[in-house]
């Protein structure tokens, strides 16, 4: 993954960071390492995968060639390289046992952190997922619509209007009580 490649360029060491690796659906939930049975089933060679490294673990120090160019050395630490994992880690919380978050962008992620994964049938039916978090926690979450719709409306209007313009037009609409279920499955694979 891209963050792992940057760490390799800095240190010359190959690892896969846990939070990002967890989003591949190729990690074993129980062991938090690559699931070689799934890889074999999918005919994916296991030798392209590296050891899983937890965030905040030292990867090592800069390669000699980089140290010579910049004139100093520094230790490279694995960050939670999945953007939502970093966002959740940085979010303020008064009580880590009762913590909800909404991380919004093109897509939004609504969830909490839990100590043990939840792979129940009910979770599957509700389309909830378990992604790796900091300190071996799980980000138990649901992907929901974020700004994707308004980004695509803007694009389909050839960027003629700013986001502010679109919001102003929507607020002046005659019928302000139209409800669009932005999480309807029709938006998951649109033609536009």
Residue map of PLM features:
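Active-site core segments that coordinate phosphate-bearing ligands/cofactors
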Residues: 1, 8-13, 26-28, 32, ...
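Short glycine-enriched loop/turn motifs at secondary-structure junctions
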Residues: 19-21, 46, 135
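A conserved helix-loop-beta module that forms one wall/lid of the active-site cleft
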Residues: 36-56
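Short beta-strand-loop/turn "lid" adjacent to the catalytic site in phosphate-handling enzymes
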Residues: 3, 7-28, 51-54, 59-60
């Amino acid at each position: 993954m891209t963050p792992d490649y940057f760490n390799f360029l800095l240190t010359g060491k190959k690892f896969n960071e846990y939070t990002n690796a967890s989003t591949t659906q190729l990690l074993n939930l129980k062991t938090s390492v690559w699931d070689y049975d799934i890889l074999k089933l999918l005919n994916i060679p296991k030798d392209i995968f590296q050891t899983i490294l937890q965030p905040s673990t030292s990867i090592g120090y800069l390669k000699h060639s980089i140290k010579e160019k910049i004139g100093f050395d520094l230790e490279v630490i694995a960050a939670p390289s999945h953007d939502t994992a970093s966002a959740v880690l940085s979010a303020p919380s008064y009580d880590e046992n009762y913590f909800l978050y909404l991380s919004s962008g093109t897509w939004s992620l609504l969830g909490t952190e839990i100590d043990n994964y939840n792979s129940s049938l009910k979770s599957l039916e509700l389309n909830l997922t378990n992604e790796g978090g900091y300190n071996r926690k799980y980000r138990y979450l649901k992907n929901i619509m974020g700004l994707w719709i308004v980004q695509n409306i803007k694009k389909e209007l050839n960027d003629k209007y700013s986001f502010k313009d679109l919001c102003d037009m929507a607020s002046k609409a005659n019928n302000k009580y139209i409800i669009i279920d932005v999480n309807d499955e029709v938006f998951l694979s649109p033609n536009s």
